[in-house]
Amino acid sequence: MRHRKSGRQLNRNSSHRQAMFRNMASALIGHEIIKTTLPKAKELRRVVEPLITLAKEDSVANRRLAFARTRNVETVAKLFNELGPRFAQRAGGYTRILKCGFRAGDNAPMAYIELVDRPEVAEAATE
């Protein structure tokens, strides 16, 4: 019985799943929007949101925890220098999932996952 076992398996072993979500979290924090399958996006939300909450308070201990979870120095720097201050007044709900149809090859449901207060690229280019 799988009672009280949270999280999706996604047809991967645990080390593959952990590495995949580390990479996806780094990509989302770096680019602030990524396109992936809907189940992966929903599961990625459970990885990224606690990292942003951790980044709200800048301390050496929190930076080490974030590095232990992402293993990427650039990701940790962006988390604590940009995203932590940006989301300081927001109590959770840092990501948004937008469904965007189905993948051509296997008809898998696709989605964009993005950070909610992401600066618009088009607005920045016109100003």
Curated annotation (Swiss-Prot):
One of its GO terms (cellular component) is cytosolic large ribosomal subunit. It holds the Pfam family Ribosomal_L17. InterPro entries: Ribosomal_bL17, Ribosomal_bL17_CS, Ribosomal_bL17_sf. The keyword Cell membrane does not apply. One of its GO terms (biological process) is translation. Belongs to the bacterial ribosomal protein bL17 family. Part of the 50S ribosomal subunit. Contacts protein L32. This is Large ribosomal subunit protein bL17. The lineage of its organism: Bacteria, Pseudomonadati, Pseudomonadota, Gammaproteobacteria, Pasteurellales.
